[in-house]
Amino acid sequence: MKRLFPLLIFLIPLSVFAQNKDRESAAAEKARKRQEKKEKINQLIKQEEEGALIYQKQHAYNFNFHTDGWSFLFEKGKYKTIKKTSLWWLSFGERKHPKEERVPTVSSTGGLLIVSSYIYGKINNFYSLNLGLGEQRLIGGKGNKNGVAVSFIYGGSVAAGLLRPYYLEVLNPTTGARDEIKYTDATKNQFLDAGNIIGKGSLTKGWNEMTVVPGFQARTALRFDYGRYNEILSAIEVGLHASYYTKPMPMLLDVPEKKFFFNAYVSLSFGKRK
């Protein structure tokens, strides 16, 4: 033990010294990368000031939170000038009626307690599929490496309104079995009898029964890009959608059906430039 003590006295400071060197080396590496990034951005700004396109293409994934639902959008862009980018996009989402109210339910089967919920009076899930073209114009933040670049986006798309029948799980008053039903003239009484409703139907029901209604959609937005000189695209977008369909879109019973829909949205955008 006495022989080990001097060895420990020697090794402990050596270990501390090695750890300090590792930390200093890691800090130096981070500083070097920051400096390289700064120099690259300065070079890109200089190229842009000379009129050169610093990137040719971009793509982004947008997660949109609407005032009446949600959507996911994939977007591709081609830079035309420093300030102008041509865009095309494909989006899919779901629209919900503002009068929808979710009703919780509790039931039992085989000795198990099942907690579920449903929307009373809902007859269709309303999905939207859009293929669009547009343009993105830089309106603020040019040459500002520390700030936010602001762009105006506008365009239009052909739209398909997809109506999927909304299924409920109900207790059959005759057989006592659990049935999954959609709203029809034949099932109207069961569908609206809240006392016999167990919960919503299976997510797999109704996809092969969808009705497609054509339409079109207009899009305007402001995009706040937090790294326009970076290869990684990260932005927040706020905008408006106006959609029109060729037929009324039934969603809830005893609620007027509409062809025209208007909403606002906030979007988180992530992507890449090259």
Residue ranges and their predicted role:
Residues 153-236, 241-253, 257, 270:
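Outer-membrane beta-barrel transmembrane domain signature
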Residues 92-128, 134-145:
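Outer-membrane beta-barrel translocator/channel fold
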Residues 63, 72-78, 131-137, 156-160, ...:
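Residues on the lipid-exposed face of transmembrane beta-strands in outer-membrane beta-barrel proteins
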Residues 41, 48-55, 106-117, 194-203, ...:
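Flexible, solvent-exposed coil segments and beta strand-coil junctions
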Residues 1-52:
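Cleavable N-terminal export/targeting peptides
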Residues 47, 51-57, 79-86, 123, ...:
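Short loop/turn motifs that connect adjacent beta-strands in outer-membrane beta-barrel proteins
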Residues 26-34, 259-274:
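Outer-membrane beta-barrel "beta-signal"
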Residues 55-59, 66-70, 84-86, 125-129, ...:
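Residues that define the transmembrane beta-barrel architecture of outer-membrane proteins
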